[in-house]
Amino acid sequence: MISGPDRSLFAYALVTAAYWAFMLTDGALRMLVLLYFHINGFDPISLAFLFLLYEFMGMVTNLGAGWIAARYGLNLTLYAGLVLQVGTLALLAVANPTTVGLASVLLVMGLQGLAGAAKDLTKMSAKSAVKVLVPEGEAGESRLLRWVARLTGSKNAIKGLGFFVGAGLLQTIGFSAGLWVLAGGLALILLGALALMPAGLSGRKRAALPFSTIFSTSSALNRLSLARVFLFGARDVWFVVGVPLFFYAQGWTFAAVGAFMAVWVMGYGVVQGATPNLLAIRTGAIGRSVRALRVWGAMLVMILLALSATVLSLQVDGLTAVVAGGLILFGGAFAINSTLHSFLVLAYAEAEDVTLDVGFYYMSNAAGRLLGALLSGVIFQTFGGVAGKSGLLACLLVATLFCALAWLVSIRLPQTSTKVEAR
């Protein structure tokens, strides 16, 4: 029988493994859908629309899932996310639409919506589980920061690997067969989690909980959530459609695009995992994290301004290396900002309300991704220009504006833990 700290560590390891497996399929599915439907004639706006319901369902799911987990436990939402993803992969493999048209777009949008719901069920459960498993107090704050950084960083490294896996599956065995491989592997992980997960992960269930409690009453969480909307909107407005299609327009193969995006996300994940050590945060984690967020938020704005000016001044032939290098610099600074956000939401949240607070916060995260995904396709197609230069520049300028707004909101975050008003 596993008990005490060993039990918490074992539960954390199982949750992390399930989350890793899910994010591998999530990254692979994103690259499979993006590249497969691009070669089947979908234009940038159509591709962006394929991901809209994915992000919208993430918003809806986070709100509802936080309430469900508070009522019935984290185990239920974790397993539901894994089951839903297996089903989505299988359904998309069977459907396998290849023609451009309203029916195909709606079908893939619907299935992507299921994938979005699955992703946020799993993510909310995994992130909330860390708060449940880590003890309170200043030592707990430091441990919470380390565990959040490792979970978030490793998740993104695995998702980056998923990009590579998705591109590789498309190039080797094709769209449908690749989806079946992903569905089968995730089903095995689900069975392992069901068999091995220790009791008690769910935390304290609350029977009498009005649905209105899904909305946060904490000014700190509301500010952080608004900053998250702009932060992730800034990333996805050029990352979702603009960057992959820009590289493809420069003659890159599917495998090359997938490999670069994979390495970028994996490196981004490594930086996230190393953030507590990079910033040397040991004690006073909340205050030091807020101060670091002010510095690194400004750094993001400066990187994007410099990259935008460089893209504007160069010809298309010299842009590929510049965009790749700029994306790497942006990824490092963004990873630090994102990790600090992920820690602060759990630090500000009350243990008994963690699923509600995390659900509300990641609803904002999904809203930012939704906004960014939509604008990425619309802006890139509207301003595309020669080989996508003007479209990419327009995406970068919007990303700069969003990062500036995220920074402005973040500078007013409190430097101590705040109690959430009674729900």
Segment roles from a protein language model:
Residues 186-198, 307-312, 395-423:
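Multi-pass alpha-helical transporter architecture, strongest
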Residues 2-56, 220-264:
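Helix-loop boundary and gating motifs at the non-cytosolic
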Residues 289-341:
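C-terminal transmembrane helical hairpin of 12-TM major facilitator-type secondary transporters
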Residues 83-101, 299-316:
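C-terminal ends and interior cores of transmembrane alpha-helices
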Residues 170-185, 318, 378-404:
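A membrane-interface helix-boundary motif in multi-pass transporters
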Residues 20, 88, 101-122, 320-337:
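Hydrophobic core of transmembrane alpha-helices in multi-pass small-molecule transporters
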Residues 49-67, 262-275:
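Central cavity-lining transmembrane alpha-helices of secondary-active solute carriers
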Residues 111-155:
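Cytoplasmic helix-loop-helix junction between adjacent transmembrane helices
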